[in-house]
A protein has these predicted regions:
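...with weaker cross-activation on analogous glycine-rich loops/strands in unrelated enzymes
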Residues: 1-35
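Aromatic- and glycine-rich peptidoglycan recognition patches
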Residues: 24-60
Length: 60
């Protein structure tokens, strides 16, 4: 993925959750998101992670 891409999660527990990719380091990313694990404000709640079960949207 690239910085600025919209990450879309799919699967039984995260279907449709979206986040914006803020950093990329090899196969790991960081994202900014809201409504993750009860957090209402936009922020980076996961740190570096290797995504699974996601696709990306690239805005023009």
């Amino acid at each position: 993925p690239q910085v600025g891409a919209i990450m879309v999660e799919y699967g039984p527990t995260a279907y449709g959750h979206v986040a914006v990719v803020s950093m990329v380091n090899g196969s790991q990313i960081q994202v900014r998101e809201a409504n993750y694990n009860g957090n209402q404000a936009i922020g980076n709640y996961r740190g570096w992670f290797t995504p699974g079960g996601v696709t990306y949207i690239y805005p023009n």
